[in-house]
């Protein structure tokens, strides 16, 4: 990928900053998400909660279903590919998807290698649970990073852990001397230029969203206050009692994340949140995929 194309892709991802990206399974849900103010939608045949419940191998969604969602909304549409499955990515690029998420939510196709994202024109989103993972994905050509969390649980604890971990490691890099950055880059297994960027700017070179377990407006505001630049909401909306109201409330929470009065108002009368699964009740399946 030409350097100027990558810069363009990073800028495209920056345009989603401060927004909410919602998992949708059909055109009707996509229209609900768009009406609620979503910045983009993620087209998925099965949302993470269902993938977790059913088990088995989960793959890229049917291109026909993705195209139906593309035709239903005017906001950007994303879709997921398996880690390392560059042919699934080629297919999504062929149907002119707006963003590709190389996702640990699906069953990995390759246990060692990720997709070479520089081979594609479409911007890629990747998950990371610490600074090393984030910078390695960026070195491969990712235009956007999100926390991995533990999708499909409705439990925010993993996303919080990953965001705090990333922030702590960024602060550690900032406190290093210039001549210590080379060793840090070697330890993180990334080009020194990326570590130098973090040292100078105190943040990732690409936009950084939160994902995994976000189920309430308060969850979304929590992740924003911890440093996220936007949020992904998967199972939390359409597994809840009142998806339309909850979707709108989460969008408002991301915009007003530092205003407790507004957060209190929009948290009222949302119907039942998704039941969720406590992290202590499950085996951590997805967050450990793709390091």
From Swiss-Prot:
Q: What's the protein called, per UniProt?
A: Pyridoxal 5'-phosphate synthase subunit PdxS
List the lineage, top down: Bacteria, Pseudomonadati, Pseudomonadota, Gammaproteobacteria, Pasteurellales
| Residues binding D-glyceraldehyde 3-phosphate | 164
The gene from which this protein is expressed is: pdxS
Q: Which residues form the active site?
A: 80
Q: Which family does it belong to?
A: Belongs to the PdxS/SNZ family.
Q: How does it assemble?
A: In the presence of PdxT, forms a dodecamer of heterodimers.
Top enzyme class, one word, equals: lyase
Q: Which reaction does it catalyse?
A: aldehydo-D-ribose 5-phosphate + D-glyceraldehyde 3-phosphate + L-glutamine = pyridoxal 5'-phosphate + L-glutamate + phosphate + 3 H2O + H(+)
Name the species this protein comes from. Answer: Haemophilus influenzae (strain ATCC 51907 / DSM 11121 / KW20 / Rd)
What are the protein's UniProt keywords?
Lyase, Pyridoxal phosphate, Schiff base
Q: What does this protein do?
A: Catalyzes the formation of pyridoxal 5'-phosphate from ribose 5-phosphate (RBP), glyceraldehyde 3-phosphate (G3P) and ammonia. The ammonia is provided by the PdxT subunit. Can also use ribulose 5-phosphate and dihydroxyacetone phosphate as substrates, resulting from enzyme-catalyzed isomerization of RBP and G3P, respectively.
């Amino acid at each position: 990928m030409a350097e100027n194309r990558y810069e363009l892709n990073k800028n495209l991802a920056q345009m989603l900053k401060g927004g909410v990206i919602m998992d949708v399974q059909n055109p009707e849900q996509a229209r609900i998400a768009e009406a609620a103010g979503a910045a983009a939608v993620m087209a998925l045949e099965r949302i993470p909660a269902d993938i977790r419940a059913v088990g088995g191998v989960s793959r890229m969604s049917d291109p026909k279903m993705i195209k139906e969602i593309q035709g239903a909304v005017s906001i950007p549409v994303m879709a997921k590919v398996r880690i390392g499955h560059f042919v699934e990515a080629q297919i999504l690029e062929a149907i002119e998807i707006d963003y590709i998420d190389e996702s640990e939510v699906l069953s990995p196709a390759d246990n060692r290698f990720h997709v070479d994202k520089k081979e594609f024109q479409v911007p890629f989103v990747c998950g990371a649970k610490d600074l090393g993972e984030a910078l390695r994905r960026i070195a491969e050509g990712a235009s956007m990073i999100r926390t991995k969390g533990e999708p499909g649980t409705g439990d925010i604890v993993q996303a919080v852990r990953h965001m705090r971990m990333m922030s702590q490691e960024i602060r550690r890099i900032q406190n290093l001397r210039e001549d210590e950055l080379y060793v840090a880059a070697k330890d993180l297994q990334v080009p020194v230029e990326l570590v130098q960027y973090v040292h100078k700017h105190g943040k990732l070179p690409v936009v950084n969203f939160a994902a995994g377990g976000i189920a309430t407006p308060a969850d979304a505001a929590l992740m924003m206050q911890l440093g996220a630049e936007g949020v992904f909401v998967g199972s939390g909306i359409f597994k809840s009692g009142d998806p339309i109201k909850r979707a709108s409330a989460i969008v408002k929470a991301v915009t007003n994340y530092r205003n407790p009065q507004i957060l209190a108002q929009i948290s009222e009368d949302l119907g039942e949140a998704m039941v969720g699964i406590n992290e202590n009740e499950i085996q951590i399946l997805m967050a450990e995929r793709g390091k």
